[in-house]
Amino acid sequence: MPSRLTPHKSPKEQVSWHHRFTMSEIATADIPDMRVSDVELKMPSSSPSYTSLTLQQLSESGYSSQELFFIIGSDAFSEIEQWHNYPNLIEQSHFVVISRSGLSNVEVRKKIPSLSGRMRTISATKDQIADLDRTTKSLSIWLIETKTRNVSSSDVRELLYKNQSTDGLLPAAVRSYISKHHLYSDRPHTTVLP
């Protein structure tokens, strides 16, 4: 689900929601049972896209908190206590925390000891991930330890700005879409620090 207006970025720093939605559809086209949600497009445009408001909108659309799994990197999750509407936010869905290079899930437990009792560690096997929704009746925070590349979306955008290879980082069809629509060819009007 592409964010309509990320709270920590200005509109000038973001490619349009329509393009991000289309790229998400292209990237997930071959994944069975996965679809990209447009719920954020339907939300009021006057406020930033806070996760808690999006999860509330999904709840009002008929999804129970037990059916929702918010997938997030360990680096972003480690800052969850600073997010809008915390701690209520973590009562709105399960959280699936994927380890990122430089911040293991063991370190996440240490950074947020108040949530440690709700955290469950599993390996990134297909069977364990498929069983997430059947292993507990309460909302959980699933820590998935896996090997990920040490690359961020900012790093990928930087490669695109420099017209460098993104092989292995972006599906070829997404890179083709980016080229066709001349996305990420100019830097946003912000200062980029080294």
What spans do the regions from the language model cover?
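Nucleotidyltransferase catalytic core that binds NTPs
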Residues: 1-194
